[in-house]
Amino acid sequence: MFCSVSSLDAEVACVERADLVVCDLWDHESGHHSRPLARALAAGMITREDVVELPDLVAGRHPGRTSDDQRIFSTPVGLAIEDVAAAARVYRKAEELGLGTELSLWRNPIWT
């Protein structure tokens, strides 16, 4: 997964090579001409139909990644608190469906 969090941190070719392209909301993303999806659209590398909106993934209207080999390009925009809220919802849905893998990020956290 490649997550583009600013206007110029991704080459447009990353979008073209992705098997799944995800953004928060297409109308918001496509209006920012310096962002990777808008540049890929202008270059004819993708169409609107190639892009999945995050709400469609969360609501289950799009299956998302269908194999471990797929490359995902994600371009979240907005406030970090929105990302936390979306992540919490995705986590609860994955937990409900019995999906995902629990990761141990630290063996002995230094802050506890």
Residue spans for each PLM region:
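Adenosine-phosphate binding glycine-rich loop
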Residues: 14-111
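Aromatic-anchored, glycine/proline-accented short structural segments
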Residues: 1-18
